[in-house]
């Protein structure tokens, strides 16, 4: 299935690219999420007319993402968790706990944006967690885990 991308999609292409994708990916994800349209001649003509508008919208989204990333880079969150004397947590600190700590600081974020490739954190200490606020912008969030009293 051929589609025209209406925005940048990670590991697929940029705005305006005509790409070949599997039918299920196109019909069930890209098109319903307004990330792409079918690559018909009529849609190609409509896209060319709307290209400037879509590029402006993409630039605004990138600028907003860079502002959010700057705010996140300057932020350190402190999470208190029950831990043993050796510093091992009685559980773990994952995406939900980090998201909740950011919401307490009035920073809106979705769980999908927080990336923890090694999985949840299991011990006390300072960590750097990646936050993908945009496909081109990655922020580094400082997370400090302290033992609960």
UniProtKB/Swiss-Prot annotation:
<dbReference type="Pfam" id="PF01281">
    <property type="entry name" value="Ribosomal_L9_N"/>
</dbReference>
<dbReference type="GO" id="GO:1990904">
    <property type="term" value="C:ribonucleoprotein complex"/>
</dbReference>
<keyword id="KW-0699">rRNA-binding</keyword>
<dbReference type="GO" id="GO:0003735">
    <property type="term" value="F:structural constituent of ribosome"/>
</dbReference>
<keyword id="KW-0687">Ribonucleoprotein</keyword>
<keyword id="KW-0689">Ribosomal protein</keyword>
<dbReference type="GO" id="GO:0019843">
    <property type="term" value="F:rRNA binding"/>
</dbReference>
<keyword id="KW-0694">RNA-binding</keyword>
<dbReference type="InterPro" id="IPR020069">
    <property type="entry name" value="Ribosomal_bL9_C"/>
</dbReference>
<dbReference type="InterPro" id="IPR036935">
    <property type="entry name" value="Ribosomal_bL9_N_sf"/>
</dbReference>
<protein>
    <recommendedName>
        <fullName>Large ribosomal subunit protein bL9</fullName>
    </recommendedName>
</protein>
<dbReference type="GO" id="GO:0006412">
    <property type="term" value="P:translation"/>
</dbReference>
<dbReference type="InterPro" id="IPR036791">
    <property type="entry name" value="Ribosomal_bL9_C_sf"/>
</dbReference>
<comment type="function">
    <text>Binds to the 23S rRNA.</text>
</comment>
<dbReference type="Pfam" id="PF03948">
    <property type="entry name" value="Ribosomal_L9_C"/>
</dbReference>
<dbReference type="InterPro" id="IPR000244">
    <property type="entry name" value="Ribosomal_bL9"/>
</dbReference>
<dbReference type="InterPro" id="IPR009027">
    <property type="entry name" value="Ribosomal_bL9/RNase_H1_N"/>
</dbReference>
<comment type="similarity">
    <text>Belongs to the bacterial ribosomal protein bL9 family.</text>
</comment>
<dbReference type="InterPro" id="IPR020594">
    <property type="entry name" value="Ribosomal_bL9_bac/chp"/>
</dbReference>
<dbReference type="GO" id="GO:0005840">
    <property type="term" value="C:ribosome"/>
</dbReference>
<dbReference type="InterPro" id="IPR020070">
    <property type="entry name" value="Ribosomal_bL9_N"/>
</dbReference>
């Amino acid at each position: 299935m051929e589609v025209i991308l209406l925005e940048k999609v990670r590991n697929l292409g940029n705005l305006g690219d005509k790409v070949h994708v599997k039918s299920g990916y196109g019909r069930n994800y890209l098109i319903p999420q307004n990330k792409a349209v079918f690559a018909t001649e009529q849609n190609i003509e409509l896209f060319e007319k709307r290209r400037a508008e879509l590029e402006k919208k993409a630039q605004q989204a990138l600028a907003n993402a860079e502002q959010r990333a700057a705010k996140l880079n300057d932020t350190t969150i402190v999470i208190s968790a029950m831990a043993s004397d050796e510093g091992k947590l009685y559980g773990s600190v994952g995406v939900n706990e980090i998201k909740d700590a950011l919401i307490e600081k009035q920073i809106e974020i979705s769980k999908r944006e927080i990336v923890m490739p090694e999985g949840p954190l299991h011990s006390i200490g300072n960590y750097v967690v990646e936050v993908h606020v945009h496909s081109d912008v990655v922020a580094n969030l400082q997370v400090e885990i302290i033992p609960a009293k």
